[in-house]
Amino acid sequence: MIFKFSQKALVALCLVVGLAEAVPSKSRVVSRASTFDYNGIVRGVNIGGWLVLEPWITPSIFDNAGDAAVDEWTLTATLGQDQAKAVLSQHWSTFITQGDFHRIAQAGMNHVRIPIGYWAVSSLPDEPYVDGQLEYLDNAISWARDAGLKVVIDLHGAPGSQNGFDNSGRKGPIAWQQGNTVSQTVDAFRALAERYLPQSDVVAAIEALNEPNIPGGVSEAGLRDYYDQIADVVRQINPDTSVFLSDGFLSTASWNGFKTGEDVVMDTHHYEMFDNYLISLDIHGHVKSACDFGKQIKGSDKPVVVGEWSGAVTDCTKYLNGKGVPTRYQGEYANNPKYGDCGDKTQGSVADLSDQERADTRRFIEAQLDAYEGKNGWLFWTWKTEGAPGWDMQDLLANGVFPSPLTDRQFPNQCA
């Protein structure tokens, strides 16, 4: 998480290209002894903000560290190794527990996607990060096994940052693909693969890298070469494991012909609050946009999972655009026009919203469920926050805004 730059033209182009290049949506990967058939439907949720921090998911951790702490790099640099290890260990041991995995399964999910940074397995000299995350990832694999869930392990942050977003560990310029950063990423991925891919009864897939930012400057040719190296690593360790490949903010159809039939799943993310056009839409426009996106991804010749999406339609959540960065919705960001007032949407629970806002949120969620299950399913972002209406699945479930059971519809046939 998260796509954070405006790309109205790119979104429109992707929709046009994706529909124009559409191929039958029931394309299949080579049949192998996988623990999950990704030609089927993924229904799951991300465990965001746990083993890779994001200021908007746990703002208290960053507020307590002072103004300089805007990502995990600056947080650990500000606190120092000892204090950072103490703060993060407390967070890792309490934010997510075994009970969360059982609640996810009880809600009808079959998958969790768990972000992890390279620094957890392959720390580099002179970097401030602390390790210790793998103990908790080990626990998560056991909890998923006990709950009957499949796991996608997601390499969420790479050396140098592959997207410049705070969720990569370090906000700022994109330096991935410079120097030795790609080989360092392969080393980190290999360490994760060697540790977890043998547990194929639970770890059904592993993601090569989260959100490499091609529009932001990542070389597409270099990314394809990196994906080739990652596929080789997986084949060497456990060829029954599927590999998730991010679309890099291109249309999924633009990857047609690349590794088709190799147990590869395209991962695409869809948010409607980081673009000036999309954030301006009313609920009817948001529903149509989600349904159109569902049609677009059918143009892929590989399985496609929408690996991140949300029930929110504004960027009002505290620190969503980054710590200290204002909102587009209220017209405070980069001289944007004002679209509305954030009101109760900055923090707290979806229960604090008006009846109409809750109904619209449910309607938007239902449209996305229908749209994404038209291909190969979805992974909601995210399971838990300190209070972010529209983003917090457990809060949405508790307040009847996320369907339970998942097939329940108050707004049926929106994408028909």
UniProtKB/Swiss-Prot annotation:
Keyword Ion transport: no
Family: Belongs to the glycosyl hydrolase 5 (cellulase A) family.
Keywords attached to this entry: Carbohydrate metabolism, Cell wall biogenesis/degradation, Disulfide bond, Glycosidase, Hydrolase, Manganese, Metal-binding, Polysaccharide degradation, Secreted, Signal
UniProt-annotated catalytic positions: E211 (proton donor), E308 (nucleophile)
Function description: Beta-glucanases participate in the metabolism of beta-glucan, the main structural component of the cell wall. It could also function biosynthetically as a transglycosylase.
CC annotations in GO: cell surface; extracellular region
Predominant subcellular localization, coarse grouping: secreted
UniProt xrefs under SUPFAM superfamilies: (Trans)glycosidases
Sections of the chain in a coiled coil: none
Recorded name of the encoding gene: exgA
Reactions listed under catalytic activity: Successive hydrolysis of beta-D-glucose units from the non-reducing ends of (1->3)-beta-D-glucans, releasing alpha-glucose
A Gene Ontology BP annotation from the UniProt entry: glucan catabolic process
MF terms (GO), sorted A to Z: glucan exo-1,3-beta-glucosidase activity; metal ion binding
Compartment list: Secreted
EC numbers on record: 3.2.1.58
Keyword Translocase listed: no
Protein name per UniProt: Probable glucan 1,3-beta-glucosidase A
Pfam families with a match to the protein in the record: Cellulase (PF00150)
Disulfide bonds: C291-C415, C316-C342
Signal peptide feature range: 1-22
Cofactors required: Mn(2+)
Enzyme class: hydrolase
Quaternary structure note: Monomer.
Annotated transmembrane regions: none
